[in-house]
Amino acid sequence: MEGGSSGNTSTSCLMMMGYGDHENNNNNNGNGNGNGNGNVTICAPPMMMMMPPPPPSLTNNNNAETSNNNILFLPFMDNNNNNNPQEDNNSSSSSIKSKIMAHPHYHRLLTAYLNCQKIGAPPEVVARLEEICATSATMGRSSSSSGGGIIGEDPALDQFMEAYCEMLTKYEQELSKPFKEAMVFLSRIECQFKALTLAPNSSHESALGEAMDRNGSSDEEVDVNNSFIDPQAEDRELKGQLLRKYSGYLGSLKQEFMKKRKKGKLPKEARQQLVDWWLRHIKWPYPSESQKLALAESTGLDQKQINNWFINQRKRHWKPSEDMQFVVMDAAHPHYYMDNVLANHFPMDMTPSLL
């Protein structure tokens, strides 16, 4: 950046505003608008359109409406048109720079502009900008004590400085809001990743994690490690509540499911024991109740499974002989063939009370 003496670093950013860059071709008026010393005055000031320069860290090309809202229409200064345009422009530029730097609001304007540049900038750049701002404040105080500009001497310049300071302040607020939201989002995501990847560093923390799994509470974790909050604590707490509430119902469902599984193919060892008993009693494969209980205890099956197995086995693999058919017929009508109608049809199924 270029400019006058002190504070030249920030002056060129103000020259893009177009302040004092208008030529007046009315030189025949007896009451001229300029004099020999290059002072700048106002003569029916026209309007100019000005926009703030966006900082290099953030740009937005998609919101035309917001950009249009930042446009200000400010009066700019007239200067005298001499015969040498190049010398006149240089003289006018130097005069405007001096007036801006000597204005009481110059430090405020510079601070607002540098605050926009700080948003999203690296730490070293922010430190450099703060150093420039502090240096400018020191020079501004010394300039005020030595008799700088006074508000009211140039109303157009006062309006220019005030409006642009307010515009830069508003621009800084609009830039900082999405930047802060993005930083909060990144911080939350970082905490979640730490919670997923951080392993317990001691047996105490491991035991604490097991207690949390059982109780579904994250209070202990907050006491041990305050650097982050476990995002899964709420899920574990809900899981613990559901288990405590529905554990009995889930247990009954599990038992019912196991019973349904048992209704399928019997285990190999249990089936072999039933086959062995079948072969030993092939002539009359009707186990008594006591024998069924003994088989159920040895095989691990229930009595219903044993009854079903023997029923299916007799239908598929057993046909009674002629003698057995007569016994079965007698058993179907005991009152025709036996004196004791209370007698058991099958001796092997007789209980001690009936013997």
Curated annotation (Swiss-Prot):
GO cellular component: nucleus
InterPro entries: ELK_dom, HD, Homeobox_CS, Homeodomain-like_sf, KN_HD, KNOX1, KNOX2, TALE_homeobox
PROSITE patterns: ELK, HOMEOBOX_1, HOMEOBOX_2
Amino acid composition bias (Low complexity), ranges on this chain: 79-96
Organs and tissues of expression: Expressed in developing lateral organs and developing ovaries in flowers.
Pfam short name (any one): KNOX2
Subcellular location: Nucleus
Annotated spans, Disordered: 75-96
An example Gene Ontology molecular-function term: DNA-binding transcription factor activity, RNA polymerase II-specific
Principal place of residence: nucleus
Domain ELK as annotated: residue spans: 237-257
Highest rank taxon of the organism: Eukaryota
Keyword vocabulary terms for this entry: DNA-binding, Homeobox, Nucleus
DNA-binding region(s), residue ranges: 258-321
Function: May have a role to play in formative events in ovule and embryo morphogenesis. Probably binds to the DNA sequence 5'-TGAC-3'.
Record-stated family: Belongs to the TALE/KNOX homeobox family.
PANTHER family tied to this protein: HOMEOBOX PROTEIN TRANSCRIPTION FACTORS (PTHR11850)
Name used for this protein in its record: Homeobox protein knotted-1-like LET6
Organism of this sequence: Solanum lycopersicum
